[in-house]
Regions:
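N-terminal, post-signal-peptide region of Sec/Tat-exported proteins
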Residues: 53-89
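Non-catalytic architectural context of zinc metalloproteases
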Residues: 75-84, 88, 92-265, 283-286
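Juxtacatalytic substrate-recognition/specificity segment
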Residues: 219-346
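Early extracytoplasmic/domain-onset interaction patches
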Residues: 24-68, 154
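C-terminal recognition in membrane/secretory proteostasis and scaffolding
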Residues: 358-359, 367-621
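Sec-dependent N-terminal signal peptides
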Residues: 4-12
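C-terminal motif of bacterial Sec signal peptides marking the signal peptidase cleavage site
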Residues: 15-16
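An active-site-proximal "capping" alpha-helix that borders the catalytic cofactor pocket
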Residues: 85, 255, 349-361
Length: 621
């Protein structure tokens, strides 16, 4: 999690080729779980799901929706979105059921159960935008039901499992309006234009394959043998799949080149949902990884350059999850328990090393400059220092679902990435620049792979065997231990030192302190009174209490304040600007130029030229 593209050809495209075989003919004689999801005749914003039951030899059985799903690291309780749960025998008689907890139903007379049915509510329209770790489900892990327009099917929000039957094959039939098309990495085995049929080997495979139904807007391309599909839902049509494909192709080509032979994935799908940010739309932005897909949710109002930058950062992160945890993971992940999860100790690797790769590949492949990369690492140090720097990372990881560890989760993208960076530098130093952390991950992938998980307690020893004693000592001291990382020591090995320079900051925010607020009744944006304003306000003679009506002739209010803040991040020193305000009941038009506020920021620079070879091996090796 990080926690976020051509015209439909008649009958056949890369991901929509449909053989003439019928769904019925394809169903195996082996016992299966057959699921039907109806995206037609949607009533009260709910979707009907029917699940056929296998044979049971017990008097009762349970059916559960997930409490948690892989990659989210939060309790989400998808059962709370289920209504009108019923069980039937093969004559259509309703069987007695009861609720065990929010996610689980007990079905009596299990020997006679033929199917269960229920209605699914979506998650997008109940989000409050309260952020990670709250009651909100992270949007990329959520669901959307917008009849005849869009259905975001993260399968864990629609399909559950019978106790002890998760390993049976799942066959899923989805009926949908003819005007909508489902973007997914799965292969549709039904030739109908209103029914899709998908076969998966087990429940875990099903929930790792999201489908997004909308008016067809997608592109496909091939990069080094990998088939890639980019599917987009943009409510207003502002963004199209074709408009973002060149940058996505450049990025994914660079990623494939960076990974080399470590990557064997044959298909990959990026599902981009753009939110209107209305009261009933998604508000959690980012992405969620799957082995062969990524679901991405972003605000539709983003400027194209901002959208592309965000897409590159979050999609590249999710794509690198094909290394870990897809190819390298523990038993806790391989045999994931959706309702009584045991968490792995190695989030530093699953999320941290992945985040490091998502930044390293960009400098390695020439997508960003060295200065950009150093700035990103400096920001991660700043953010990590604001967290609990003595909490053992392995302890936090194993207990991430509960406090006080839960509140430290976001550090996996900060200190976790820095752990990966330090390991990379150590390995480069000890191997005279010949190898780095990517080589380590390739060895681990060869040792384990998709179907062979490792034991949590054995990973450090295995890594040490594949690398050097210094790597093992670092892991024990700074990852399993309480000792903060001396970043200066590791930067010095590649000629990098700390520097301080003035950097422009946002005109509307100083850290977490805003300079503006909103009148909840009038929805007007107000400059906060009785605080010291920065140079931007002083230069334009803006005062506390002024109501911001428009900037550069574009009106702003609560409805589009996010867009205003986003656009402000593109302003340059000296840009011409006009601000329409209301002061003491009278409207005024202020004209002037942008004067950005600056703050002293601790940065990083390459200063020791004697270490140029080591630095080049680290960043370009």
């Amino acid at each position: 999690m990080k926690k976020i593209i051509l015209t439909l050809l008649a009958g056949c495209a890369l991901y929509s080729c449909k053989p003439s075989e019928t769904a019925a003919a394809l169903k195996s004689k082996v016992e299966t779980i057959d699921v039907t999801i109806k995206l037609i005749d949607v009533k009260d914003d709910k979707v009907m799901v029917t699940v056929t039951a296998p044979k049971f030899n017990t008097e009762e059985v349970t059916y559960s929706m997930p409490k948690i799903v892989p990659g989210t690291y939060s309790i989400d309780d998808y059962g709370k979105y289920i209504d009108d749960f019923k069980a039937f025998d093969n004559k259509g008689t309703v069987l007695p059921t009861s609720k065990l907890d929010v996610n689980t139903w007990i079905i009596k007379d299990a020997k006679n159960v033929a199917k269960v049915t229920y209605l699914v509510n979506d998650t997008f329209d109940t989000e409050k935008g309260s952020g990670f770790g709250t009651a909100d489900i992270f949007s990329p892990a959520g669901t959307n039901i917008d009849a005849d327009k869009n259905f975001m099917l993260n399968m864990h929000g629609f399909v559950g499992y019978f106790k002890d039957k998760k390993e049976l094959p799942y066959n899923v039939t989805i009926s949908h309006p003819e005007t909508l098309w489902g973007a997914t990495s799965m292969t549709d085995l039904d030739a109908s234009t209103t029914n899709d049929f998908f076969k998966t080997s087990r429940y875990a495979e099903l929930v790792e394959n999201p489908v997004m139904y909308s008016k067809p807007d997608y592109t496909t391309f091939v990069v080094d043998g990998m088939e890639i599909l980019i599917g987009v839902y943009s409510p207003t049509g502002k963004v199209t799949a074709e408009s973002i494909t060149p940058e996505m192709k450049t990025m994914m080509t660079a990623q494939k080149t960076f990974l080399g032979k470590i990557n064997a994935t044959k298909k990959y799908t990026v599902l981009l949902y753009l939110s209107t940010m209305s009261e009933t739309d998604a508000k959690g932005f980012g992405a969620l990884e799957h082995p062969t897909a990524t679901t991405v949710v972003m605000p539709e109002m983003l400027l194209k350059d901002e959208l592309l930058k965000s897409m590159i950062d979050v999609v590249s992160h999710e794509f690198f999850h094909i290394v870990t945890p897809l190819s390298v993971h523990s038993k806790e992940i391989h045999d994931f328990d959706y309702n009584a999860p045991k968490m792995s100790k190695h989030l530093w690797m699953y999320e941290g090393v992945t985040e490091y790769f998502a930044n390293l590949f960009q400098i390695n492949q020439g997508l960003i400059t060295e200065e950009d990369f150093y700035k990103r690492m400096a920001e991660k140090i700043e953010h990590a220092n604001a967290m609990n720097d003595t909490m053992p990372f392995t302890t936090m990881s194993a207990n991430v679902l509960t406090e006080p560890y839960k509140e430290q989760y976001l550090n996996v993208y900060e200190k976790g990435a820095l752990i990966g960076m330090c390991l990379d530098i150590i390995i480069r130093e000890k191997s005279n620049g010949e190898r780095g952390i990517l080589d380590l991950m390739q060895k681990l992938s060869n040792e384990y792979g998709v179907s062979k998980p490792f034991n949590d307690n054995e990973l450090f020893a295995k890594i040490t065997t594949f690398t050097y004693p210094e790597v093992g000592a670092f892991l024990e001291k700074h990852v399993a231990g309480e000792t903060p990382i001396p970043y200066d020591l590791y930067f010095s090995k590649v000629g990098i030192t700390k520097t301080s320079k003035k950097e422009p900051v946002n005109v509307f925010l100083k850290g977490q302190m805003p300079y503006i607020s909103v009148d909840q009744q009038t929805k007007e944006i107000i400059v906060i009174p009785n605080i010291e304003l920065n140079d931007f306000y002083r230069n334009l003679d803006l005062k506390g209490g002024d109501i911001l009506k428009a900037i550069n002739d574009k009106p702003y209010s609560l409805e589009n304040i996010y867009e205003m803040i986003t656009i402000s991040q593109t302003w340059k020193e000296g840009d011409a600007i006009t601000v329409k305000i209301k002061r003491n009941g009278s409207e005024q038009l202020l004209k002037g130029t942008v004067k950005l506020p600056y703050e002293d920021k601790e940065g990083l620079s390459f200063t020791d030229t004697s270490k140029k070879a080591q630095k080049e091996a680290w960043l370009k090796g």
